[in-house]
A protein has these predicted regions:
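Long, contiguous binding/interaction regions
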Residues: 1-171
């Protein structure tokens, strides 16, 4: 079963924000989604969920049941659009491009990168960047050829690619 989504992302916006993202992605173990939409700490330690008393999984008198999926999993899927952080980051430009003078208002910067996520693109993370005044232009493809799409500044369009017979045999 295909599990990864390949993305080509280009970001442009206020220099101070773009530089922070760029520097963070250059680190040995970058956490792009966590930087943009931080997951609350308690999601790591919340092993049980409260269920209604009539729910079939409700096994205790306290209304709590062991949850088969950890709280972080559901939170990430809802708030990041993917269960894991971005991985295998490769920059498409060698350097951060600065547009203007960093000591003056209105200075911008831009860079592009390629990465993978689990199952789909991190649309909520991209939306958060757009809300911060950052331009996001991204193309994405499912590794199994089930979908592909384009995201530009809050507008997402995805489709099923047309596959020829050879592609279908390889799937």
């Amino acid at each position: 079963m295909p599990n990864h989504c390949d993305q080509q992302v280009h970001l442009r916006g206020p220099w101070n924000l773009i530089k922070e993202i760029y520097d963070h992605l250059k680190q040995a173990d970058p956490m792009f989604c966590q930087l943009i939409k931080p997951m609350p700490f308690e999601m790591f330690v919340k092993p049980r969920v409260k269920l209604p008393s009539h729910h079939p999984l409700n096994v205790g008198t306290d209304g709590l049941a062991q949850c088969s999926t950890p709280a972080w999993y559901d939170w990430r899927c809802e708030n990041w659009g993917t269960k894991w952080e971005v991985c295998d980051i490769q920059f498409t430009e060698a350097e951060l491009t600065v547009i203007g003078n960093v000591y003056e208002d209105g200075c911008e910067a831009e860079f592009g990168f390629h990465c993978w996520t689990a199952w789909g693109p991190p649309l909520p993370v991209w939306n958060a960047l757009v809300d911060l005044g950052i331009s996001v232009d991204a193309d994405y493809q499912d590794e199994g050829g089930m979908f592909e799409g384009r995201y530009v500044n809050g507008e997402d369009e995805s489709w099923e690619p047309e596959l020829d017979e050879e592609d279908l045999e390889d799937a």
